[in-house]
Amino acid sequence: MSSASVNQQACDLTNKYRYKRFTTTLLFRDLRFAKGAAGSGDSFPSFDLVATNGDHLTNSVVFGDKPVLLVFGSMTCPMTASAAPSLLQLYDEFGDRVKFIMLYVREAHPGEHFTQAETMEEKLEYARALKEFYDIPWTVAADNVDGDLHRALDPKPNSAYLMKNDGTILFRSLWAADKDAIRQALDAAAAGRVPIRQQSTALFGPVVRAMGKVQEVMERGGPQAVRDLWRAGFPMALAGRVATLFSPLSPDQRGIAAVLTLATGTVVMIGVLGAWVMT
């Protein structure tokens, strides 16, 4: 293969990773782990991350004294917003026995206010914004602009990985908002045990609860982020908009209320149409 072909392939990978617009294809890819992606029993890939304070985090620095929970996140990810409160609670519970790291990866829903970072300086700026916005007390770091570690694992927007102190993956969760599954895994790892469950791929609960954060987070990204979600993920955009009608409720409850409202409306509409057809 010629050097020109290799360079073109590298450029294509970069463009796909640092996408400018959210698409339906990306939405469906985010709903499950890729076949063959790193999981329980695998060694964590090599990495060299930069923390928001400028420190470099490598395998030898991160692993050694205690288990490590690493979570993906970004400023325009509703799942990150939904997971933040439960992660803060888990940190209060396990932070003295498990090392927590938030990895800023790439913007889930890029827009005018938060475009995809094109330089390491910009990526670190976004990582600092993430740490400040959610008042994260543990280490927040950034992958490089091409997302080498993110892609080596499985480039999901808000998954979580729990490792032994030697870097062996014990558990992974598709969504960091799956608080109960992550707590059980943390409890086992903190006690030196292997978690009974090696992964969580729960979809309905975490995603439904996150609907209460969708509109707020899309607006944070900018008008483009809002438009792209309506185009690429209409049901999610609609649920997020309906959730704003339940503002007195907590974000989790707003998401549940929105989905129940839409489901009830759909059933009623089907019933009315059925009755009309039968007349």
Where are the regions that the model predicts?
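Non-globular targeting/processing and membrane-anchoring segments
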Residues: 1-68, 176-279
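Extracellular/periplasmic catalytic domains that process cell-envelope and extracellular macromolecules
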Residues: 40, 63-64, 95, 153-155
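Short, compositionally biased leader-like segments
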Residues: 2-21, 117-137
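A short helix-to-beta-strand connector/capping loop
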Residues: 43-45, 96, 135-138
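Conserved catalytic-core segments centered on acid/base and nucleophilic motifs
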Residues: 69, 78, 90, 160-163, ...
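Short active-site neighborhood of thiol/selenol oxidoreductases, capturing the structured segment around
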Residues: 56-88, 99-104
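Thiol/disulfide oxidoreductase modules built on the thioredoxin-like
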Residues: 134-136, 142-185
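Structural microenvironment flanking redox-active thiols in thiol-disulfide oxidoreductases
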Residues: 81-134, 148
